[in-house]
């Protein structure tokens, strides 16, 4: 029997595994995908808002080229930490069941059954997109994750959402020759939009380079058209892709 099993091999899961090992506990980290699997899905050239010292774990310094780390630097860093700490990892092994009580848990995966006294659930919040629940949302043209702008060059792209991820996706697509329309449920962009992003997107909207509908929701999605509920009534726009940057929630 293990002393502790950690479900999830992201930064929090790795930090938990490091602490358990340093306390002399028999620990195991189980991850359904790759190491730091959520980071794999982040935009390819993403830059973190946090500075390196806020992302460090286990006392390992996080060297970066710039003031704020990029996605590939984070992936390299956490892989290096996991290797240096010689953590007991099981990757690409989804947990299918967790049962028991404090002191006696059973963790079932696709490959094995494990017994443990304690469980740390560190699965993050990037697995389950917040759906719009509208007709057509399951079309292939609808994406809940944004990797890079290149597939959307010279197409009509609607970006749904008003937070940082939506703003960054819209600006990236615009700068790669996409015809961008933003659909924002609120009357303005969220208060958490970073100070260097807000004036950029607002200026692009003001000059007409990016179209924007505020106080607006998506009512339906068709292969070539996006239907909207706006303050002025129903509207329809030409559309090739929908980037639904509507946030995420934990998978439990």
List where the protein language model places each region.
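A Rossmann-like FAD-binding core segment of flavoenzymes
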Residues: 90-93, 97-99, 104-107, 114, ...
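Rossmann-like dinucleotide/flavin-binding elements
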Residues: 1, 6-32, 145-190, 252
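Dinucleotide-binding Rossmann-like beta1-alpha1 core, especially the glycine-rich loop
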Residues: 58, 63-64, 81-85, 91-92
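FAD-binding core/adjacent interface of flavoenzyme oxidoreductases
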Residues: 1-7, 22, 37, 41, ...
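N-terminal FAD cofactor-binding segment of flavoenzymes
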Residues: 15-27, 31-55
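Glycine-rich active-site loop/strand segments that organize a redox cofactor
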Residues: 40-75, 209
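Short, glycine/charged-enriched secondary-structure capping and boundary segments
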Residues: 20, 42-46, 104, 133-137, ...
